[in-house]
Amino acid sequence: MAVYNYDVVVLGSGPAGEGAAMNAAKAGRKVAMVDSRREVGGNCTHLGTIPSKALRHSVKQIIQFNTNPMFRAIGEPRWFSFPDVLKNAEMVISKQVASRTSYYARNRVDVFFGTGSFADETSVNVVCANGVVEKLVANQIIIATGSRPYRPADIDFSHKRIYDSDTILSLGHTPRKLIIYGAGVIGCEYASIFSGLGVLVELVDNRDQLLSFLDSEISQALSYHFSNNNVMVRHNEEYERVEGLDNGVVLHLKSGKKIKADALLWCNGRTGNTDKLGLENIGLKANGRGQIEVDEAYRTSVSNVYGAGDVIGWPSLASAAYDQGRSAAGSMVDNGSWRYVNDVPTGIYTIPEISSIGKNEHELTQAKVPYEVGKAFFKGMARAQISGERVGMLKILFHRETLEVLGVHCFGDQASEIVHIGQAIMSQPGEANTIKYFVNTTFNYPTMAEAYRVAAYDGLNRLF
């Protein structure tokens, strides 16, 4: 068994692992990265964020082609199969792997491909694909192994008609009808993707409102858009059993209803990838969802072992995971780059997309905060009229006395980009965080960014 010595060993090369490894390396530490694949990037690059967003982009282009009257002059609407669209999206994965591989090489981070597990608190055994075991000894170790779809034991995921959000990328045909169980972020994103391909979608939600953490007006807008695009949303439903057939699948619900479709996509929760880490060898224990507990410095109960990303739970976003990894390494090397990551914008890549940051109306009402609302509807924006993306709105919540911006909520094209302007103002200290910034600033014209000016005037005009 070969033995290698490092200052820091990072388990997992997804966003959290990459952020941790890069920050530790730039602080002068000798760093090793361990990943179970033969390529870096983690589930984010290979099965999650990158392929699903590339898929979405391709589907959005198809929708634009099929709905734009200008293109009718050159032909009829075109139909694309899911495998064809996926093949186009997969090209992005190889480009991401190449970019990320170069980051590790440039920063002198050694990458080991194999399954890593703790031998003790300062050493990790890596079982390579050829069976060779290598031992990495380190002063500090960061767990950033990510997560995978939660799979209930009573569902046969080996059935050819039953998929989760990882295996759906191996779907070799375009179903006429698809059941999606779980209406969280992933479920809603895939509902948009498949409905955009003309698939009838049954979206089963075990709550009474889609994405209930969102501002209710935004959630309602998404619900309306789904119902207008061949997505049947069924609220307050729980599965009883899933019956796989040769020609389809039947979802039996506890309410007594039955739904039949060509395939079922399970999108109900995720599990941390901790079961093969040998946590028992260092006295750590994951919770029922495979997640480990950390403090605000991202340190576990074992003083030299840290955690970041999906494996520690909330918010389970790639954007947050990268910053958590950087912060875990910053805390570890004490280079001033540590911060507890909690001011995270939400980005949901439905069609149209959704993004928000800060408080929503329900939260402010419950807290008895005297707030006011300003809105800008995209249908009135010149840039939206030019692009044809006229569905959507920007909503600003602000304190009616101090004018402090308390929340920004956006539904529509480029929402995940638009929200960052509001995020920047909300992060300003004291009186610099004010809705007046948007009326005292000149925006390029025509842009979607000027929706902030329109929404700010709308809100300020409500004051008396």
Swiss-Prot record:
Cellular localisation: Cytoplasm
Domain of life according to the entry: Bacteria
Residues that, per the record, bind FAD: 35-44
Catalytic activity, as annotated: NAD(+) + NADPH = NADH + NADP(+)
Coiled-coil regions listed: none
Keywords recorded for this protein, A-Z: Cytoplasm, FAD, Flavoprotein, NAD, NADP, Oxidoreductase
Entry-linked InterPro entries: Class-I_Pyr_Nuc-Dis_Oxidored (IPR050151), FAD/NAD-bd_sf (IPR036188), FAD/NAD-binding_dom (IPR023753), FAD/NAD-linked_Rdtase_dimer_sf (IPR016156), Pyr_nuc-diS_OxRdtase (IPR001100), Pyr_nucl-diS_OxRdtase_dimer (IPR004099), STH_gammaproteobact (IPR022962)
UniProt record, GO biological process: 2-oxoglutarate metabolic process; NADP metabolic process
Cofactor note: Binds 1 FAD per subunit.
NAD is among the record's keywords: yes
GO molecular function: dihydrolipoyl dehydrogenase (NADH) activity; flavin adenine dinucleotide binding; NAD(P)+ transhydrogenase (Si-specific) activity
Cofactor(s) in the UniProt record: FAD
Recorded GO CC terms: cytosol
Homology family: Belongs to the class-I pyridine nucleotide-disulfide oxidoreductase family.
Purpose: Conversion of NADPH, generated by peripheral catabolic pathways, to NADH, which can enter the respiratory chain for energy generation.
PANTHER family: DISULFIDE OXIDOREDUCTASE, SOLUBLE PYRIDINE NUCLEOTIDE TRANSHYDROGENASE
Name of the protein in question: Soluble pyridine nucleotide transhydrogenase
Organism: Pseudomonas syringae pv. tomato (strain ATCC BAA-871 / DC3000)
